[in-house]
Amino acid sequence: MEIGTPLFEGAKKLLWLGGGELGKEMVIEAQRMGVETVVIDRYDLAPAMHVAHRKYVVNMHDGGAIESIIRKERPDAVIAEIEAINTETLSKIEMDGIKVMPNARAVKICMDRIELRRFAAEKVKVPTTAYGFATSPEEVKKMCKDVGYPCIIKPQMSSSGHGHEVIYDESQVEEKFKEALTHARGKSKTVIVEEYVKIDRELTVLTYRYPLSSGGVATKTIYPVEHQRPQGVYHYIESWHPATVSQDVISKASEYATKVVNELGGFGIFGVEIMIAGNRVLFNEVAPRPHDTGLVTLVSSDISEFQVHVRSALGLPTPDVKVVTPAAAHVILASGEKWAPKYINVDKALEIPGVQVRLFGKPVTYNERRMGIVLATGNSVEEAKEKVRKASALILVS
């Protein structure tokens, strides 16, 4: 393979649909490899736009606009960084010979909880919580009786835990159904109703596929990342690497992740979410891209999840990824709305040995928006976790 020079004829070019913090890290990895980079997002000054060669600001559901930009740029691959995109456009450009990462079908399945649950539980046959689907409060009541109270409902499409509602008894059904749908993406009025389990541990199995020079495909897993969310919080807060669970759990989680990812196909890295509840190891969801909990691999691994995805997009191999040190990551969250925020006490956070701070450069804050992340290495996972908790508590967003 030849890699040309950016902005000249023969350059390799990658285009991202979505320019958040995950996209930013991927663009940086692509820049390190001499790749021309293009980012599309719904708002200007998105994090990945700061480091890309070119940017476009469009409605991410406007299939015509997205398609026209992709046809103009003719990238070597299109990388879906977010799920809130027009999947019909991805299928169309893929049929016209433009590579979509990991593939258009996988993106479509992964952004739709109902399609994904049917795919995982009924086609791939990996263990999940008991579940059902509903389109009205009456149907939710029936499903809740089937799976048992308490149960949890989620919109068919949403991200970062938005719209996840726990129902403890029948009197809450109408209110929780309405609340779930207020966070739904698109026009769907369908929810998934799931058995509520007490989660003891949560893992992300970063699983990736790349083409072999012999013509085959290799599927590999990185030693799992562990993460936790406080009770009632459904978005990412903290992760650490390597996971501190038994080898039996690691084996089952890796087996389920490999099955799901091989059935989805394509190339690149997938973040497969696994829940551990008592002696049950359960598939939860999968992201068809680098995972937010995998930000910790920026310091824990010899090759980050972002570099793995970029390599696969270019058709390059990643034979192995090794965990080189215990590490942890903790988010920096905003409170309230503000334009052009400032960050206080970064210097104090960096006085802690082994700590790094990554500020994403988002132009606007809103309550609980992820604005940065603290990373730390240590002699143990517990030491690294203590460092990131202390450092993240010092940093204020104002």
From Swiss-Prot:
CC annotations in GO: cytosol
Full protein name: Formate-dependent phosphoribosylglycinamide formyltransferase
Quaternary structure, from the entry: Homodimer.
InterPro entries to which the protein is assigned, alphabetical: ATP-grasp, ATP-grasp_carboxylate-amine, ATP_grasp_subdomain_1, PreATP-grasp_dom_sf, PurT, PurT/PurK_preATP-grasp, PurT_C
Gene Ontology MF terms in the entry: ATP binding; magnesium ion binding; phosphoribosylglycinamide formyltransferase 2 activity; phosphoribosylglycinamide formyltransferase activity
Binding site for N(1)-(5-phospho-beta-D-ribosyl)glycinamide: E21, L22, E81, D292, K362, R369, R370
Keywords: ATP-binding, Ligase, Magnesium, Metal-binding, Nucleotide-binding, Purine biosynthesis
Catalytic activity field: N(1)-(5-phospho-beta-D-ribosyl)glycinamide + formate + ATP = N(2)-formyl-N(1)-(5-phospho-beta-D-ribosyl)glycinamide + ADP + phosphate + H(+)
Enzyme class: ligase
Record lineage: Archaea, Thermoproteota, Thermoprotei, Sulfolobales, Sulfolobaceae
Alphabetical GO biological process terms: 'de novo' IMP biosynthetic process
Function field: Involved in the de novo purine biosynthesis. Catalyzes the transfer of formate to 5-phospho-ribosyl-glycinamide (GAR), producing 5-phospho-ribosyl-N-formylglycinamide (FGAR). Formate is provided by PurU via hydrolysis of 10-formyl-tetrahydrofolate.
Highest taxon listed in the record's lineage: Archaea
The keyword Metal-binding is annotated on this UniProt entry: yes
Pathways involved: Purine metabolism; IMP biosynthesis via de novo pathway; N(2)-formyl-N(1)-(5-phospho-D-ribosyl)glycinamide from N(1)-(5-phospho-D-ribosyl)glycinamide (formate route): step 1/1
Presence of keyword Nucleotide-binding: yes
Positions of Mg(2+) binding: E273, E285
EC number: 6.3.1.21
Boundaries of every ATP-grasp domain copy: 118-314
